[in-house]
Amino acid sequence: MRSDARVNKEKPFIDPDFDQDALIKFMGVSHETFCKLVPRYKDPARTLDYINSLRAEYAAKILMEHSDCSADDIASKCGFRNTAAYLSAFKFAFGITPTDFMNSMKQMFKKKQN
């Protein structure tokens, strides 16, 4: 999506109410134009998958910078409505749980130190 850089910079997805309509408004286009620009997101459920992937990527960044954050804190900071939604979206985006992600980051950090 062409506005990925702006979305990642401004992080409108941290609002739990950020949905397809909010994304379209954020992009400053009509619904029709949005569907032409990104036809794969014509279905609101697929748009939500995209938004949740942005949230999961942001969660991974927070985890790398603040490994002491709780799952509840990260879910809240990233715009997920609850911790279960965060855990599910994270696993969907990365194929591993946030805990496994942190463990692998710690392992990589240890290897770099040796």
What are these regions (language model features)?
Residues 88-114:
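…primarily DNA-binding HTH/wHTH and HhH modules…
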Residues 18, 45, 68-70, 81, ...:
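Residue-level signal for the short linker/turn that defines the boundary of a DNA-recognition helix
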Residues 1-17, 26-27, 48-68:
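A short, Lys/Arg-enriched amphipathic alpha-helix from helix-turn-helix/homeodomain DNA-binding modules
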